[in-house]
Protein backbone atom coordinates (compact mmCIF):
# COMPACT_ATOMS: atom_id res chain seq x y z
CA UNK A 1 0.00 0.00 0.00
CA UNK A 2 1.71 3.25 -1.10
CA UNK A 3 1.95 6.10 1.38
CA UNK A 4 1.28 8.76 -1.27
CA UNK A 5 -1.70 8.48 -3.64
CA UNK A 6 -0.30 10.19 -6.77
CA UNK A 7 3.45 9.59 -7.28
CA UNK A 8 5.15 10.89 -10.39
CA UNK A 9 7.52 13.03 -12.40
CA UNK A 10 7.45 16.17 -14.52
CA UNK A 11 9.52 16.24 -17.71
CA UNK A 12 10.55 19.88 -17.92
CA UNK A 13 13.13 22.23 -19.42
CA UNK A 14 13.49 19.49 -22.02
CA UNK A 15 15.25 21.47 -24.75
CA UNK A 16 17.78 20.93 -26.17
CA UNK A 17 18.82 17.63 -24.57
CA UNK A 18 15.69 15.50 -24.28
CA UNK A 19 14.17 17.01 -27.41
CA UNK A 20 17.42 16.39 -29.31
CA UNK A 21 17.60 12.80 -28.08
CA UNK A 22 13.97 12.15 -29.09
CA UNK A 23 14.59 13.66 -32.53
CA UNK A 24 17.64 11.40 -32.99
CA UNK A 25 15.98 8.28 -31.55
CA UNK A 26 12.41 8.53 -32.85
CA UNK A 27 12.71 11.02 -35.71
CA UNK A 28 10.03 13.34 -34.31
CA UNK A 29 10.06 16.95 -33.17
CA UNK A 30 7.80 16.01 -30.25
CA UNK A 31 7.30 13.19 -27.80
CA UNK A 32 5.00 10.64 -29.42
CA UNK A 33 3.35 7.57 -27.91
CA UNK A 34 6.43 5.42 -28.53
CA UNK A 35 8.55 7.74 -26.42
CA UNK A 36 5.95 8.18 -23.71
CA UNK A 37 5.34 4.43 -23.50
CA UNK A 38 8.98 4.02 -22.45
CA UNK A 39 8.64 6.81 -19.89
CA UNK A 40 5.44 5.26 -18.53
CA UNK A 41 7.24 1.93 -18.25
CA UNK A 42 9.97 3.62 -16.22
CA UNK A 43 7.42 5.26 -13.90
CA UNK A 44 5.61 1.97 -13.34
CA UNK A 45 8.83 0.04 -12.69
CA UNK A 46 9.65 2.59 -10.00
CA UNK A 47 6.12 2.16 -8.56
CA UNK A 48 4.91 5.57 -9.66
CA UNK A 49 1.52 6.23 -11.26
CA UNK A 50 1.46 9.90 -12.29
CA UNK A 51 3.04 12.31 -14.75
CA UNK A 52 3.15 15.89 -15.95
CA UNK A 53 4.36 15.72 -19.58
CA UNK A 54 6.99 17.92 -21.20
CA UNK A 55 5.58 21.30 -22.22
CA UNK A 56 8.27 23.70 -23.48
CA UNK A 57 7.82 23.05 -27.18
CA UNK A 58 5.73 19.89 -27.04
CA UNK A 59 2.03 19.32 -26.52
CA UNK A 60 1.26 15.90 -25.07
CA UNK A 61 -2.39 15.98 -26.13
CA UNK A 62 -2.15 17.77 -29.48
CA UNK A 63 1.08 16.31 -30.90
CA UNK A 64 -0.04 12.68 -30.88
CA UNK A 65 -3.62 11.58 -30.04
CA UNK A 66 -2.17 8.18 -29.08
CA UNK A 67 -0.29 9.74 -26.15
CA UNK A 68 -3.31 10.04 -23.89
CA UNK A 69 -4.64 6.63 -24.94
CA UNK A 70 -1.26 5.05 -24.17
CA UNK A 71 -1.28 6.57 -20.69
CA UNK A 72 -4.78 5.22 -20.06
CA UNK A 73 -3.90 1.77 -21.39
CA UNK A 74 -0.79 1.57 -19.20
CA UNK A 75 -2.48 2.91 -16.08
CA UNK A 76 -0.54 6.17 -15.71
CA UNK A 77 -2.59 9.14 -14.52
CA UNK A 78 -1.78 12.32 -16.41
CA UNK A 79 -1.91 15.91 -15.28
CA UNK A 80 -0.70 19.27 -16.55
CA UNK A 81 1.83 21.47 -14.81
CA UNK A 82 1.23 24.23 -12.29
CA UNK A 83 0.64 26.87 -14.99
CA UNK A 84 -1.38 24.75 -17.46
CA UNK A 85 -4.98 24.67 -16.22
CA UNK A 86 -7.89 22.49 -17.28
CA UNK A 87 -6.01 19.65 -19.03
CA UNK A 88 -4.57 21.96 -21.69
CA UNK A 89 -0.91 22.18 -22.66
CA UNK A 90 0.66 25.62 -22.84
CA UNK A 91 1.74 24.96 -26.43
CA UNK A 92 -1.89 24.53 -27.46
CA UNK A 93 -2.37 28.21 -26.64
CA UNK A 94 1.07 29.41 -27.76
CA UNK A 95 0.69 27.92 -31.25
CA UNK A 96 -2.55 29.83 -31.80
CA UNK A 97 -1.78 33.00 -29.89
CA UNK A 98 -2.70 35.23 -32.83
CA UNK A 99 -6.07 33.52 -33.10
CA UNK A 100 -6.75 33.32 -29.38
CA UNK A 101 -5.45 36.71 -28.25
CA UNK A 102 -4.04 37.54 -24.83
CA UNK A 103 -3.66 34.98 -22.04
CA UNK A 104 -5.49 37.42 -19.76
CA UNK A 105 -8.68 36.31 -18.08
CA UNK A 106 -9.69 39.87 -17.26
CA UNK A 107 -9.80 40.89 -20.93
CA UNK A 108 -10.23 37.59 -22.78
CA UNK A 109 -12.48 35.45 -20.58
CA UNK A 110 -14.76 34.16 -23.33
CA UNK A 111 -11.94 32.69 -25.42
CA UNK A 112 -10.10 31.29 -22.41
CA UNK A 113 -13.26 29.65 -21.05
CA UNK A 114 -13.76 27.95 -24.41
CA UNK A 115 -10.13 26.80 -24.30
CA UNK A 116 -10.73 25.38 -20.81
CA UNK A 117 -13.94 23.64 -21.88
CA UNK A 118 -12.22 21.89 -24.79
CA UNK A 119 -9.63 20.51 -22.38
CA UNK A 120 -12.24 19.00 -20.06
CA UNK A 121 -14.19 17.60 -23.00
CA UNK A 122 -11.08 15.80 -24.18
CA UNK A 123 -10.23 14.51 -20.70
CA UNK A 124 -13.73 13.45 -19.69
CA UNK A 125 -13.12 9.72 -20.19
CA UNK A 126 -9.64 9.71 -18.63
CA UNK A 127 -8.36 9.66 -15.06
CA UNK A 128 -6.46 12.91 -15.65
CA UNK A 129 -5.90 15.02 -12.53
CA UNK A 130 -7.17 18.49 -13.45
CA UNK A 131 -5.02 21.51 -12.58
CA UNK A 132 -7.11 24.57 -11.74
CA UNK A 133 -6.21 28.22 -11.23
CA UNK A 134 -4.13 30.30 -13.62
CA UNK A 135 -0.71 31.95 -13.87
CA UNK A 136 0.88 34.18 -16.49
CA UNK A 137 1.58 33.30 -20.11
CA UNK A 138 4.22 30.57 -19.99
CA UNK A 139 5.16 30.00 -16.34
CA UNK A 140 5.26 33.65 -15.27
CA UNK A 141 3.39 35.68 -12.65
CA UNK A 142 0.01 36.99 -13.77
CA UNK A 143 0.76 39.83 -16.16
CA UNK A 144 4.48 39.73 -15.39
CA UNK A 145 7.89 38.34 -16.27
CA UNK A 146 10.06 35.61 -14.75
CA UNK A 147 12.29 36.89 -11.98
CA UNK A 148 10.35 40.15 -11.57
CA UNK A 149 7.54 38.97 -9.31
CA UNK A 150 8.36 41.61 -6.68
CA UNK A 151 7.23 44.28 -9.15
CA UNK A 152 3.68 42.91 -9.18
CA UNK A 153 2.93 42.60 -5.45
CA UNK A 154 0.76 45.71 -5.66
CA UNK A 155 -1.62 43.76 -7.93
CA UNK A 156 -2.04 40.84 -5.53
CA UNK A 157 -5.53 41.67 -4.26
CA UNK A 158 -6.75 42.37 -7.79
CA UNK A 159 -5.27 39.06 -8.98
CA UNK A 160 -6.83 37.21 -6.05
CA UNK A 161 -10.29 38.52 -6.92
CA UNK A 162 -9.73 37.45 -10.50
CA UNK A 163 -8.56 34.01 -9.35
CA UNK A 164 -11.76 33.51 -7.33
CA UNK A 165 -13.70 34.15 -10.52
CA UNK A 166 -11.48 31.73 -12.44
CA UNK A 167 -12.02 28.97 -9.85
CA UNK A 168 -15.78 29.45 -9.98
CA UNK A 169 -15.93 29.31 -13.77
CA UNK A 170 -13.54 26.36 -14.04
CA UNK A 171 -15.65 24.37 -11.60
CA UNK A 172 -18.80 25.29 -13.52
CA UNK A 173 -17.22 24.06 -16.76
CA UNK A 174 -16.18 20.77 -15.12
CA UNK A 175 -19.74 20.25 -13.88
CA UNK A 176 -21.32 21.08 -17.25
CA UNK A 177 -18.99 18.84 -19.26
CA UNK A 178 -18.91 15.82 -16.94
CA UNK A 179 -22.52 16.04 -15.86
CA UNK A 180 -21.38 15.50 -12.28
CA UNK A 181 -20.65 17.66 -9.27
CA UNK A 182 -17.15 19.14 -9.67
CA UNK A 183 -15.95 17.46 -6.47
CA UNK A 184 -16.36 14.11 -8.24
CA UNK A 185 -13.48 14.99 -10.55
CA UNK A 186 -10.04 15.17 -8.82
CA UNK A 187 -8.44 18.61 -9.07
CA UNK A 188 -5.24 20.25 -7.85
CA UNK A 189 -4.24 23.86 -7.20
CA UNK A 190 -0.50 24.56 -7.21
CA UNK A 191 0.81 27.07 -4.66
CA UNK A 192 3.88 27.82 -6.76
CA UNK A 193 5.93 31.02 -6.47
CA UNK A 194 3.58 34.03 -6.20
CA UNK A 195 0.49 31.80 -5.88
CA UNK A 196 1.61 30.72 -2.41
CA UNK A 197 1.50 34.39 -1.44
CA UNK A 198 -2.13 34.53 -2.58
CA UNK A 199 -2.92 31.56 -0.34
CA UNK A 200 -1.15 33.13 2.63
CA UNK A 201 -3.22 36.28 2.07
CA UNK A 202 -6.44 34.27 2.29
CA UNK A 203 -7.26 32.92 -1.18
CA UNK A 204 -8.94 29.52 -0.90
CA UNK A 205 -10.29 26.73 -3.11
CA UNK A 206 -13.16 24.29 -2.42
CA UNK A 207 -12.55 21.53 0.11
CA UNK A 208 -12.11 18.72 -2.42
CA UNK A 209 -9.18 20.31 -4.28
CA UNK A 210 -5.65 19.03 -3.57
CA UNK A 211 -3.37 21.82 -2.33
CA UNK A 212 0.03 21.43 -4.02
CA UNK A 213 2.89 23.05 -2.11
CA UNK A 214 6.35 23.59 -3.58
CA UNK A 215 9.98 23.73 -2.63
CA UNK A 216 12.07 26.83 -3.33
CA UNK A 217 13.17 25.31 -6.67
CA UNK A 218 16.42 24.23 -4.97
CA UNK A 219 15.18 21.32 -2.86
CA UNK A 220 14.08 23.18 0.28
CA UNK A 221 10.37 23.07 1.11
CA UNK A 222 8.95 26.58 1.42
CA UNK A 223 5.87 25.85 3.51
CA UNK A 224 4.04 22.99 5.19
CA UNK A 225 0.43 22.82 6.45
CA UNK A 226 -0.19 23.57 10.11
CA UNK A 227 -2.48 21.44 12.28
CA UNK A 228 -5.63 23.25 11.18
CA UNK A 229 -4.68 23.24 7.50
CA UNK A 230 -3.98 19.51 7.61
CA UNK A 231 -7.73 19.03 8.07
CA UNK A 232 -8.29 20.19 4.47
CA UNK A 233 -10.35 17.29 3.01
CA UNK A 234 -8.72 17.44 -0.43
CA UNK A 235 -5.31 16.75 1.05
CA UNK A 236 -1.89 18.20 0.34
CA UNK A 237 0.86 17.58 -2.19
CA UNK A 238 4.42 18.63 -2.90
CA UNK A 239 6.06 19.78 -6.14
CA UNK A 240 9.82 19.20 -5.75
CA UNK A 241 12.77 20.11 -7.99
CA UNK A 242 16.00 18.43 -9.02
CA UNK A 243 16.02 20.60 -12.16
CA UNK A 244 15.10 24.26 -12.45
CA UNK A 245 14.86 27.02 -15.05
CA UNK A 246 14.35 30.46 -13.59
CA UNK A 247 15.79 33.20 -11.43
CA UNK A 248 18.27 33.53 -9.85
CA UNK A 249 19.96 30.90 -12.08
CA UNK A 250 19.08 27.79 -14.08
CA UNK A 251 20.12 24.36 -12.78
CA UNK A 252 19.76 21.93 -15.69
CA UNK A 253 22.97 20.12 -16.59
CA UNK A 254 23.60 17.48 -13.91
CA UNK A 255 22.15 16.08 -10.71
CA UNK A 256 23.30 18.36 -7.89
CA UNK A 257 20.90 17.18 -5.15
CA UNK A 258 22.50 15.92 -1.92
CA UNK A 259 20.95 12.60 -0.90
CA UNK A 260 20.61 13.62 2.75
CA UNK A 261 18.91 16.93 1.95
CA UNK A 262 16.35 15.32 -0.33
CA UNK A 263 15.56 12.60 2.22
CA UNK A 264 15.27 15.09 5.09
CA UNK A 265 12.97 17.47 3.20
CA UNK A 266 10.70 14.72 1.89
CA UNK A 267 10.55 13.05 5.31
CA UNK A 268 9.59 16.37 6.86
CA UNK A 269 6.97 16.88 4.18
CA UNK A 270 5.37 13.50 4.81
CA UNK A 271 5.46 13.99 8.59
CA UNK A 272 3.33 17.11 8.09
CA UNK A 273 0.59 15.15 6.35
CA UNK A 274 1.52 15.89 2.74
CA UNK A 275 0.55 12.56 1.18
CA UNK A 276 -1.90 13.11 -1.66
CA UNK A 277 0.41 14.06 -4.56
CA UNK A 278 4.20 14.05 -4.95
CA UNK A 279 5.58 15.23 -8.29
CA UNK A 280 9.28 15.70 -9.12
CA UNK A 281 10.64 18.10 -11.74
CA UNK A 282 13.26 15.89 -13.44
CA UNK A 283 14.33 18.10 -16.35
CA UNK A 284 15.66 15.96 -19.20
CA UNK A 285 15.15 12.80 -17.08
CA UNK A 286 18.37 10.96 -17.99
CA UNK A 287 20.81 12.87 -15.72
CA UNK A 288 18.43 12.51 -12.76
CA UNK A 289 18.13 8.72 -12.57
CA UNK A 290 19.20 8.36 -8.96
CA UNK A 291 17.12 11.21 -7.44
CA UNK A 292 14.08 9.96 -9.39
CA UNK A 293 14.56 6.53 -7.82
CA UNK A 294 14.95 7.97 -4.32
CA UNK A 295 11.93 10.24 -4.73
CA UNK A 296 9.56 7.51 -5.91
CA UNK A 297 10.84 5.01 -3.35
CA UNK A 298 10.12 7.54 -0.62
CA UNK A 299 6.69 8.28 -2.08
CA UNK A 300 5.91 4.57 -1.75
CA UNK A 301 7.29 4.17 1.77
CA UNK A 302 8.77 7.29 3.40
CA UNK A 303 9.37 5.48 6.70
CA UNK A 304 11.69 2.85 5.27
CA UNK A 305 14.78 5.02 5.61
CA UNK A 306 16.05 6.94 8.62
CA UNK A 307 19.27 8.72 9.56
CA UNK A 308 21.02 5.51 10.54
CA UNK A 309 20.16 3.51 7.40
CA UNK A 310 19.69 6.16 4.70
CA UNK A 311 22.80 5.10 2.77
CA UNK A 312 21.24 1.65 2.36
CA UNK A 313 19.22 3.24 -0.43
CA UNK A 314 22.10 4.36 -2.70
CA UNK A 315 23.91 1.13 -1.85
CA UNK A 316 20.94 -0.94 -3.01
CA UNK A 317 20.70 1.22 -6.13
CA UNK A 318 24.41 0.69 -6.89
CA UNK A 319 24.18 -3.07 -6.27
CA UNK A 320 21.33 -3.24 -8.76
CA UNK A 321 23.31 -1.32 -11.37
CA UNK A 322 26.89 -2.57 -10.90
CA UNK A 323 26.73 -5.80 -8.91
CA UNK A 324 26.88 -6.57 -5.21
CA UNK A 325 30.66 -6.61 -4.84
CA UNK A 326 31.01 -3.09 -6.30
CA UNK A 327 28.09 -1.60 -4.37
CA UNK A 328 29.88 -0.23 -1.30
CA UNK A 329 32.49 1.75 -3.20
CA UNK A 330 30.01 2.97 -5.82
CA UNK A 331 27.66 4.12 -3.06
CA UNK A 332 30.49 5.97 -1.31
CA UNK A 333 31.42 7.82 -4.50
CA UNK A 334 27.80 8.60 -5.43
CA UNK A 335 27.16 9.94 -1.94
CA UNK A 336 30.27 12.15 -1.96
CA UNK A 337 29.51 13.36 -5.48
CA UNK A 338 26.03 14.51 -4.43
CA UNK A 339 27.55 16.26 -1.40
CA UNK A 340 30.24 18.08 -3.39
CA UNK A 341 28.01 18.92 -6.37
CA UNK A 342 25.27 20.17 -4.07
CA UNK A 343 27.45 22.99 -2.77
CA UNK A 344 27.11 25.10 -5.91
CA UNK A 345 25.44 24.16 -9.20
CA UNK A 346 27.52 24.00 -12.37
CA UNK A 347 25.62 26.96 -13.81
CA UNK A 348 26.24 29.07 -10.69
CA UNK A 349 29.95 28.27 -10.39
CA UNK A 350 32.57 30.85 -11.39
CA UNK A 351 36.07 31.95 -10.38
CA UNK A 352 34.73 33.96 -7.43
CA UNK A 353 32.68 31.17 -5.85
CA UNK A 354 35.30 30.12 -3.30
CA UNK A 355 38.00 32.00 -1.39
CA UNK A 356 41.38 31.75 -3.06
CA UNK A 357 43.41 33.44 -0.33
CA UNK A 358 42.35 31.06 2.46
CA UNK A 359 42.96 27.96 0.37
CA UNK A 360 39.26 27.13 0.16
CA UNK A 361 39.31 27.05 -3.66
CA UNK A 362 42.17 24.57 -3.77
CA UNK A 363 40.55 22.41 -1.09
CA UNK A 364 37.22 21.97 -2.87
CA UNK A 365 38.91 21.45 -6.23
CA UNK A 366 41.26 18.85 -4.74
CA UNK A 367 38.31 17.01 -3.21
CA UNK A 368 36.72 16.62 -6.63
CA UNK A 369 40.04 15.61 -8.25
CA UNK A 370 40.51 12.89 -5.62
CA UNK A 371 36.94 11.67 -6.12
CA UNK A 372 37.49 11.53 -9.87
CA UNK A 373 40.58 9.37 -9.39
CA UNK A 374 38.61 7.02 -7.14
CA UNK A 375 35.72 6.80 -9.61
CA UNK A 376 38.09 6.10 -12.49
CA UNK A 377 39.85 3.42 -10.46
CA UNK A 378 36.55 1.65 -9.78
CA UNK A 379 35.49 2.02 -13.41
CA UNK A 380 38.66 0.19 -14.50
CA UNK A 381 37.82 -2.77 -12.23
CA UNK A 382 34.22 -3.22 -13.43
CA UNK A 383 33.03 -6.03 -15.62
CA UNK A 384 32.45 -4.79 -19.16
CA UNK A 385 28.66 -5.05 -18.98
CA UNK A 386 28.55 -2.54 -16.10
CA UNK A 387 30.87 0.10 -17.54
CA UNK A 388 28.41 2.15 -19.58
CA UNK A 389 25.92 2.33 -16.71
CA UNK A 390 28.70 3.35 -14.33
CA UNK A 391 29.87 6.06 -16.69
CA UNK A 392 26.34 7.43 -17.02
CA UNK A 393 25.48 7.37 -13.33
CA UNK A 394 28.80 8.05 -11.58
CA UNK A 395 31.95 8.51 -13.65
CA UNK A 396 30.74 11.17 -16.08
CA UNK A 397 29.08 13.41 -13.48
CA UNK A 398 32.16 13.18 -11.24
CA UNK A 399 34.57 13.89 -14.11
CA UNK A 400 32.44 16.71 -15.50
CA UNK A 401 32.12 18.53 -12.19
CA UNK A 402 35.74 17.89 -11.18
CA UNK A 403 36.88 19.35 -14.49
CA UNK A 404 34.63 22.38 -14.04
CA UNK A 405 36.08 23.00 -10.58
CA UNK A 406 39.61 22.71 -11.97
CA UNK A 407 38.77 25.17 -14.73
CA UNK A 408 37.36 27.88 -12.47
CA UNK A 409 40.12 27.38 -9.88
CA UNK A 410 42.66 27.81 -12.67
CA UNK A 411 40.88 30.96 -13.83
CA UNK A 412 40.97 32.38 -10.30
CA UNK A 413 44.71 31.66 -10.10
CA UNK A 414 45.28 33.16 -13.54
CA UNK A 415 43.56 36.44 -12.65
CA UNK A 416 45.39 36.67 -9.32
CA UNK A 417 48.85 36.04 -10.77
CA UNK A 418 48.28 38.29 -13.77
CA UNK A 419 47.51 41.19 -11.45
CA UNK A 420 50.79 40.45 -9.66
CA UNK A 421 52.65 40.41 -13.01
CA UNK A 422 53.69 36.84 -12.21
CA UNK A 423 54.61 34.80 -15.32
CA UNK A 424 52.96 31.75 -13.74
CA UNK A 425 49.69 33.36 -14.88
CA UNK A 426 50.32 31.82 -18.30
CA UNK A 427 50.49 28.30 -16.84
CA UNK A 428 47.05 28.75 -15.30
CA UNK A 429 45.68 30.24 -18.53
CA UNK A 430 46.76 27.03 -20.26
CA UNK A 431 44.96 25.02 -17.56
CA UNK A 432 41.72 26.93 -18.19
CA UNK A 433 41.93 26.27 -21.93
CA UNK A 434 42.70 22.58 -21.37
CA UNK A 435 39.77 22.17 -18.97
CA UNK A 436 37.38 23.95 -21.31
CA UNK A 437 38.41 21.61 -24.13
CA UNK A 438 38.12 18.59 -21.84
CA UNK A 439 34.56 19.59 -20.94
CA UNK A 440 33.64 19.35 -24.62
CA UNK A 441 35.50 16.05 -24.99
CA UNK A 442 33.69 14.52 -22.00
CA UNK A 443 30.29 15.57 -23.36
CA UNK A 444 31.16 14.36 -26.86
CA UNK A 445 32.09 10.96 -25.44
CA UNK A 446 28.77 10.78 -23.56
CA UNK A 447 26.80 11.74 -26.66
CA UNK A 448 28.61 9.81 -29.37
CA UNK A 449 30.80 7.03 -27.94
CA UNK A 450 29.28 5.75 -24.72
CA UNK A 451 26.74 2.96 -25.30
CA UNK A 452 27.39 3.27 -29.03
CA UNK A 453 25.81 6.72 -29.16
CA UNK A 454 22.55 5.55 -27.58
CA UNK A 455 22.23 8.76 -25.55
CA UNK A 456 23.21 11.20 -28.30
CA UNK A 457 22.27 14.82 -27.50
CA UNK A 458 21.63 14.16 -23.80
CA UNK A 459 24.74 16.17 -22.89
CA UNK A 460 24.47 19.24 -25.09
CA UNK A 461 23.20 21.50 -22.30
CA UNK A 462 24.96 24.86 -22.07
CA UNK A 463 26.58 25.30 -18.66
CA UNK A 464 29.64 27.57 -19.04
CA UNK A 465 29.13 31.27 -19.67
CA UNK A 466 26.07 32.37 -17.69
CA UNK A 467 25.75 36.12 -17.15
CA UNK A 468 22.08 36.21 -16.07
CA UNK A 469 19.54 33.72 -14.74
CA UNK A 470 18.93 32.24 -18.19
CA UNK A 471 21.19 30.57 -20.74
CA UNK A 472 20.65 33.32 -23.31
CA UNK A 473 24.06 32.79 -24.91
CA UNK A 474 24.71 30.83 -28.12
CA UNK A 475 27.17 28.22 -26.80
CA UNK A 476 29.48 27.41 -23.92
CA UNK A 477 32.08 30.14 -23.67
CA UNK A 478 35.58 29.71 -22.31
CA UNK A 479 36.15 31.78 -19.16
CA UNK A 480 38.30 34.85 -19.74
CA UNK A 481 42.03 34.49 -19.10
CA UNK A 482 44.97 36.90 -19.23
CA UNK A 483 48.49 36.25 -20.46
CA UNK A 484 51.78 37.97 -19.78
CA UNK A 485 53.14 38.50 -23.28
CA UNK A 486 56.81 38.74 -22.31
CA UNK A 487 57.17 36.52 -19.25
CA UNK A 488 60.97 36.79 -19.28
CA UNK A 489 60.59 40.51 -18.50
CA UNK A 490 57.98 40.00 -15.82
CA UNK A 491 58.60 40.16 -12.10
CA UNK A 492 61.24 37.72 -10.91
CA UNK A 493 63.30 36.99 -7.83
CA UNK A 494 61.87 36.51 -4.37
CA UNK A 495 58.25 37.49 -3.78
CA UNK A 496 57.20 38.16 -0.20
CA UNK A 497 53.74 39.29 0.90
CA UNK A 498 52.62 40.96 4.09
CA UNK A 499 49.08 40.66 5.38
CA UNK A 500 47.73 41.29 8.89
CA UNK A 501 51.25 41.61 10.21
CA UNK A 502 52.36 38.27 8.78
CA UNK A 503 54.96 37.87 6.02
CA UNK A 504 54.30 34.97 3.61
CA UNK A 505 56.98 33.53 1.33
CA UNK A 506 57.57 30.40 -0.72
CA UNK A 507 59.30 27.61 1.25
CA UNK A 508 62.36 27.55 -1.01
CA UNK A 509 63.01 31.18 -0.12
CA UNK A 510 63.19 30.51 3.61
CA UNK A 511 66.61 30.38 5.32
CA UNK A 512 67.28 30.04 9.02
CA UNK A 513 70.58 31.44 10.24
CA UNK A 514 72.47 28.92 12.39
Regions found by a protein language model. Give the residues of each.
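Feature activates predominantly on carbohydrate-active enzymes
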Residues: 1-107, 124, 188-192, 202-219, ...
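Glycine- and acidic
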Residues: 18-26, 48-54, 98-102, 144-157, ...
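Structured mid-domain segments that build the active-site/substrate or prosthetic-cofactor binding neighborhood
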Residues: 44, 49-52, 58-59, 66, ...
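Hydrophobic targeting/anchoring helices
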Residues: 54, 82-84, 88-134, 140-141, ...
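Gly/Pro-rich turn-and-neighbor structural signature
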Residues: 55-56, 62-65, 70-73, 100-233, ...
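Catalytic domains of carbohydrate-active enzymes that cleave complex glycans
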Residues: 311-514
Amino acid sequence: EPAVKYRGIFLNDEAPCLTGWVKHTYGTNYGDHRFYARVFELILRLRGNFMWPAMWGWSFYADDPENSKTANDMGVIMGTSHHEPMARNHQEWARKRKEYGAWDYASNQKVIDRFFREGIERAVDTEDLITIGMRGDGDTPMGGKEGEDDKYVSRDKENMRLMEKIFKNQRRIIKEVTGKAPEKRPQVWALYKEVQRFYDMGLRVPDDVIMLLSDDNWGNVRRLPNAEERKHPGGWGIYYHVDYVGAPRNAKWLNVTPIQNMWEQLQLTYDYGVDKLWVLNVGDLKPMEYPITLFLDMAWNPKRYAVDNLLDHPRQFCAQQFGEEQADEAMRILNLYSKYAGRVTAEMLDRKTYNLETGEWKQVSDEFIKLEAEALRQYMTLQQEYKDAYKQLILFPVQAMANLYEMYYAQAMNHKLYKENNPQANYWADKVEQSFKRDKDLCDDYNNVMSGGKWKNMMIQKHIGYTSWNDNFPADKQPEVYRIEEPEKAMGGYVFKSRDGVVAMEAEHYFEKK
